[in-house]
C-alpha cells in the first residue's frame, strides 16, 4: 500500500509538471519535488527531459549548487562538454569551497583531452582541502592518470588513497587496471596483504590479491 501511494504521488507530480510545461507557466515547487522529477526522467532514460526540469528548477533556486552539479552531470551524459564546463564555472563562482565542483571540472577537462590542465586543478585542491576530501581528489587524479595511460602513476595514486582508507571500494575496484598495465604485481601483493591484515573480510582485496 505504501509503494502504491508513493507511485500515485509520483505520477501526479509528473502529470502536473507535464501540464505546466505545456502551458509555459511551470508552478513553483519545493526543491524536493524537482529532485524527484529529475531522478524519474533519468531512470526512464530521458536525460533531455531531466535537463529541462533542472533548468526550470534553477530559475526558482538559482543559488542551489546541487542543481548546477546535476546539470553538469546531465550535460556530460549527453557529451555536451563545452556547456558542462560553462555551468561548472558558474557553480564555482557561487561555491568555490565545494570540492565536488573543481573535481567535476577536472573530469570534464580530462574527457576533452586537457589532462595537464586537469592535473593543475588536482594539485591546487591538494593544497586547499583537508584529509577527509583527499580520497575523492586522489580518485579523480587516478582517473586522469588512466586517461593519460600513466598506469604506474595511477597505481601509486590509488595506493595512497588506500593508505588513507583501506576500505575505499572505488579505489579497490580501479587499482587492478593499473596493476595489470604497470606490472606492479609484487607491490600489489604487498598492498593487498596489508589491507587484508586490517580487514580480513575485504572481498575486493582478496579478489585483487588472487589476480596478482
List each language-model region with its residue ranges:
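Start-of-helix register in tetratricopeptide repeats
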Residues: 32, 66, 100, 134-136, ...
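Canonical positions in the second alpha-helix
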Residues: 57, 90-91, 124-127, 160-161, ...
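Short coil turns that delineate tetratricopeptide repeat
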Residues: 62, 96, 130-132, 166, ...
Amino acid at each position: 500500500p505504501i509503494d502504491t501511494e508513493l507511485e500515485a504521488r509520483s505520477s501526479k507530480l509528473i502529470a502536473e509538471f507535464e501540464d505546466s510545461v505545456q502551458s509555459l507557466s511551470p508552478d513553483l515547487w519545493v526543491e524536493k519535488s524537482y529532485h524527484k522529477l529529475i531522478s524519474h526522467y533519468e531512470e526512464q532514460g530521458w536525460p533531455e527531459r531531466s535537463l529541462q526540469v533542472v533548468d526550470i528548477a534553477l530559475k526558482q533556486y538559482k543559488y542551489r549548487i546541487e542543481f548546477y552539479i546535476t546539470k553538469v552531470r546531465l550535460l556530460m551524459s549527453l557529451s555536451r562538454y563545452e556547456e558542462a564546463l560553462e555551468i561548472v564555472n558558474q557553480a564555482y563562482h557561487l561555491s568555490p569551497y565545494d570540492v565536488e565542483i573543481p573535481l567535476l571540472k577536472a573530469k570534464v577537462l580530462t574527457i576533452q583531452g586537457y589532462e595537464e590542465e586537469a592535473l593543475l586543478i588536482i594539485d591546487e585542491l591538494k593544497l586547499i582541502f583537508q584529509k577527509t576530501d583527499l580520497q575523492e581528489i586522489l580518485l579523480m587524479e587516478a582517473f586522469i592518470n588512466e586517461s593519460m595511460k600513466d598506469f604506474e602513476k595511477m597505481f601509486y595514486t590509488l595506493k595512497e588513497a588506500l593508505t588513507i582508507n583501506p576500505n575505499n571500494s572505488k579505489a579497490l575496484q580501479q587499482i587492478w587496471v593499473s596493476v595489470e598495465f604497470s606490472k606492479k604485481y609484487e607491490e600489489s601483493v604487498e598492498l593487498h596483504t596489508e589491507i587484508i591484515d586490517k580487514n580480513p573480510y575485504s572481498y575486493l582485496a582478496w579478489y585483487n590479491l588472487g589476480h596478482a
